[in-house]
Structure formats: C-alpha cells, structure tokens
From Swiss-Prot:
One of its GO terms (molecular function) is death domain binding. Ribosome-binding protein that promotes ribosome hibernation, a process during which ribosomes are stabilized in an inactive state and preserved from proteasomal degradation. Acts via its association with eiF5a (eif5a and eif5a2) at the polypeptide exit tunnel of the ribosome, preventing mRNA translation. Plays a key role in ribosome hibernation in the mature egg by preventing mRNA translation, leading to ribosome inactivation. Ribosomes, which are produced in large quantities during oogenesis, are stored and translationally repressed in the egg and early embryo. Keywords: Translation regulation. Associates with ribosomes; preventing translation. Interacts with eiF5a (eif5a and eif5a2); preventing translation. The keyword Endoplasmic reticulum does not apply. It comes from the Eukaryota. Belongs to the DAP-DAPL1 family. The keyword Disulfide bond does not apply. This is Death-associated protein-like 1.S. One of its GO terms (biological process) is ribosome hibernation. InterPro entries: DAP1/DAPL1. Residues 1-53 are annotated as: Disordered.
C-alpha cells in the first residue's frame, strides 16, 4: 500500500499538477488531495480586521434607515395606506364568468372476445 502512495504522489502520475480523475459509475470523479490539518484552521480563523470596517458600515446603514423612517412617517400622513391598498387591488368584474363543466366524450367500442 505504501508503494501505491509513492507511485501516485510521484510527478509522473500527476496530470496538470493533480491526480487524474477516477471513473465511478461511468462518470469521472476528481480525487481531492490536501491536508485536513491545514484547511481546518483557515475555516475557524477569526478575522477581526474585517469585522471592524463592517461594523462601521452597519452604523452608517442604520443612520440612513433612521433618516428614511422619518421621511416615510411624514409621507404616511399625506397619503393614507387605505388609498394605496385600493389602488393595488384587482378590479372586480361586472359580469361573472360562467364556468362550463367539462364534457365527457365516451367512445363506444366493441368488447374484446
């Protein structure tokens, strides 16, 4: 088994810098190589430098939302919500549409003997 690992890791077995794809069920599946030890700390690493600028951006967004909320309150007194609801509703039909039942077409066919 150790011989197989040495053969696979040799530069001759590598294609384009990685292991060749393996066929499984008629489809090619790539084998992922890498150290699990190296990838785990990157996922769990805390990025405090990126959190600080985002918190500043969040504060500016919150201030902008407060300004907009004040403007919306002024507009709500000028234009009531009931008028907006009526404008967005579908118009009621004056004549109701009559739905005809589907016709069943029975084809008379002779019985099998």
């Amino acid at each position: 088994m150790t011989k197989e690992l040495k053969v696979q890791s040799s530069p001759q077995a590598l294609k384009a810098g990685h292991l060749p794809a393996v066929k499984a069920g008629g489809m090619r599946v790539s084998k992922k190589q890498g150290n699990d030890e190296n990838s785990a700390p990157e996922k769990n690493a805390k990025k405090t430098l990126q959190e600080k600028p985002s918190s500043v951006l969040n504060m500016t967004k919150m201030q902008a939302m407060n300004i907009l909320a004040g403007e919306l309150e002024k507009l709500s007194h000028d234009f009531p919500g009931e008028a907006a609801q009526i404008a967005h509703q579908k118009p009621r039909p004056t004549v109701e549409k009559i739905i005809m039942p589907k016709r069943l077409y029975l084809i008379q066919q002779p019985r099998r003997c």
